Amino acid sequence: MGVPLRVVSYNIHSQRDDTAALAAVVRSAKPDVVIVQEGPRRFRWRQKSATLAESFGLVVAAGGLPALGNLLLTSLRVQVLDTRCQRFPLTPGRHLRGAAYADCRVAGARFTVAGSHLSTDPAERPAQAVEFKRGLDAATSPVLAGADLNEGPDGPAWATVSQGLTDAAVAADRADRLTYSCHEPRRRIDALFVDPRITVVDYDVVDTPQTRRASDHFPVLVDLLLPGTD
């Protein structure tokens, strides 16, 4: 038997929308891990990250400004063993991007959780995907990676990041579920990829009146079984 883990990957639109709805969406999901894109990354980012985590009933594991707004949050069930942040090379005139990583343990199972948010510029994304993939490949535990890739499964950056990993939506036969935008869903640009040793039990893109108020992206909610290692 594996160890259950519930994960949410969520672009929260820099908390520009209904923050009460946002908190309610995450709390109702009862996740062990939340991978946030567009989290706090500027003035007082530590305090803002802690406040966001508290509103979700979670704690900050890694990320924030050092990861350019990628933020990893966990429940107290998850033990965080180590963390690191990554910054991708800057293209002049564009936004600086990066990734966050946390090595964790839950009920005797080790895993590495990672999050990133790639550029809206298709010329930048392939190189950023290579950097993110290097970070994922450096992990010594089974990886789960949540990202807003800003492109669909037919894109080159998506292909780079997903290589050797399982697309949770495909594994659950729900790749038809679109993640963006909440106003007019047309694209699946948000994904959760997992090590093949991790079992995808269930996958959902949560589309409700509340999630439509909370952000411009729908949250990706995935139930996993981790391989026990201890």
For the regions a language model picked out, list residue spans one by one:
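Active-site metal-binding loops of divalent metal-dependent hydrolases
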Residues: 12, 39, 116-118, 147-149, ...
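Active site of divalent-metal-dependent phosphoester/diester hydrolases
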Residues: 57-77, 91-95, 150-218
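A long, amphipathic alpha-helix that forms part
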Residues: 126-141
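Short, Asp-centered acidic motifs that coordinate Mg2+ and/or phosphate
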Residues: 32-33, 111, 142-144, 167, ...
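N-terminal, active-site-proximal structural segment of metallo-dependent hydrolase catalytic domains
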Residues: 1-54, 70, 225-230
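Structured beta-strand-rich core segments of catalytic domains in phosphoester-bond hydrolases
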Residues: 2, 33, 38-110, 204
